[in-house]
């Protein structure tokens, strides 16, 4: 199990990313636009750097919904590989069964 503080930190990052998404996208569009003057682009870069670091989506980590485990995460289920296996063995995931060939 991940520490509660680590789970809370990821929730905080997700909220910040959602809050600053539009502002960040607007500034990134200015930075990548070649028709904008160099001064305006530089100002956009500086403004982008002043945004909170945790507002960047790349700072988020995929975590298991049940345990908060950051490694072995399967996006399709939102769970870690361990919890997916346990749920599959109990028959809780429809259509998922153990491979046999």
UniProtKB/Swiss-Prot annotation:
PROSITE patterns, alphabetized: RIBOSOMAL_S14
InterPro entries in the cross-refs: Ribosomal_uS14 (IPR001209), Ribosomal_uS14_bac/plastid (IPR023036), Ribosomal_uS14_CS (IPR018271)
Gene Ontology molecular functions: rRNA binding; structural constituent of ribosome
GO biological process per UniProt: translation
Keyword annotations from UniProtKB, A to Z: Ribonucleoprotein, Ribosomal protein, RNA-binding, rRNA-binding
GO cellular component, one term: cytoplasm
UniProt keyword Transcription regulation present: no
Keyword NAD: no
Highest taxon listed in the record's lineage: Bacteria
NCBIfam families: PRK08881.1
Family as reported in the entry's similarity comment: Belongs to the universal ribosomal protein uS14 family.
UniProt function note: Binds 16S rRNA, required for the assembly of 30S particles and may also be responsible for determining the conformation of the 16S rRNA at the A site.
Subunit description: Part of the 30S ribosomal subunit. Contacts proteins S3 and S10.
Protein name (Swiss-Prot/TrEMBL): Small ribosomal subunit protein uS14
Species this chain originates from: Proteus mirabilis (strain HI4320)
Gene name of this polypeptide: rpsN
